[in-house]
């Protein structure tokens, strides 16, 4: 965990990375699990933790898996620093407020849940009999899964990602041709936006598996990287092309999209409103892209130049119609680059027309 976030709440992805296979902490936890001694680990030592800690002895030594294993043989809880790099206390008794509700039945897990809610710190409970590692923080509870199980789920998700990526590629290929023909409708835009989001959601799910797998997730990471390189960037440029009012940071809108429920994502009216249009917009009405996405596909054309071209012409249609002289007048574009843009757009148009015919 981030050393600077003393006692701060971490999101689940950060926590999973913190205890992932390959980390010293996970090695120590696995040793305790195999020894079947059980254990309770508190990560962080803020004022709220001090209120619930009683007894034990001060260690204040560097963390090592071997030290954790030996100290876990005692009944009390182990207190680590926020970064997990130091063992601060061992054999402590945790005494959270008994009035804090808990859904757990075992004493160790009930204590862990209450301490997590009272302090906001990450609490790791290692089961003595069930061979289970449970993470608690505030109201969050997460049971770490077996590595083999996670790998199976990750591989299934990769297969799903491949299928959705094919569907997205087909939709984008069709959109490319429609953009050159000036035949894009709001229905096409919403359809592609939905497909982008579905692919990104599956990617985010796989990323959670990768974080939980730690060093075991290297091959999964490579597969995802190969499948959807620069996908967020392309989705962001697509948003910049079709959002009603120009925006500086399309990733804010993409984040709003990711925060939507599956039900909201299927509602065309909600997606139209997200892009700044009326919910009653006719889906068959034509809409014209600004040209960010296609211009970005031209090799060695920097994003600031793309921005200047769009700013100068407004829409892709006018950029395509512009001659070399018109392009040459745009800031940052000389005669050579103007020729490159004209040829690049022509090649893209021919390629996308051919792809569509196939």
UniProtKB/Swiss-Prot annotation:
Q: Superkingdom, according to UniProt?
A: Bacteria
Catalysed transformations (reactions): 2 ATP = 3',3'-c-di-AMP + 2 diphosphate
Give UniProt keywords alphabetically: ATP-binding, DNA damage, DNA repair, DNA-binding, Magnesium, Nucleotide-binding, Nucleotidyltransferase, Transferase
A single Gene Ontology MF term assigned here is: DNA binding
Q: Which InterPro entries match?
A: DisA (IPR050338), DisA_sf (IPR038331), DNA_integrity_DisA_N_sf (IPR036888), DNA_integrity_scan_DisA_link (IPR018906), DNA_integrity_scan_DisA_N (IPR003390), DNA_integrity_scanning_protein (IPR023763), RuvA_2-like (IPR010994)
Q: What is its EC number?
A: 2.7.7.85
Record field: transmembrane: none
DAC domain spans which residues? 9-147
Positions annotated to bind ATP:
76, 94, 107-111
Single Gene Ontology BP annotation: DNA repair
Give the protein's cofactors: Mg(2+)
One Pfam family name from the record?
Answer: DisA-linker
Keyword Translocase listed? no
Cross-referenced PANTHER family, in alphabetical order? Answer: DIADENYLATE CYCLASE, DNA INTEGRITY SCANNING PROTEIN DISA
Q: Which family does it belong to?
A: Belongs to the DisA family.
* Subunit composition and interactions: Homooctamer.
Concerning HAMAP family, the annotation shows: DisA (MF_01438)
What role does this protein play?
Participates in a DNA-damage check-point that is active prior to asymmetric division when DNA is damaged. DisA forms globular foci that rapidly scan along the chromosomes during sporulation, searching for lesions. When a lesion is present, DisA pauses at the lesion site. This triggers a cellular response that culminates in a temporary block in sporulation initiation. Also has diadenylate cyclase activity, catalyzing the condensation of 2 ATP molecules into cyclic di-AMP (c-di-AMP). c-di-AMP acts as a signaling molecule that couples DNA integrity with progression of sporulation. The rise in c-di-AMP level generated by DisA while scanning the chromosome, operates as a positive signal that advances sporulation; upon encountering a lesion, the DisA focus arrests at the damaged site and halts c-di-AMP synthesis.
The name of this protein is DNA integrity scanning protein DisA
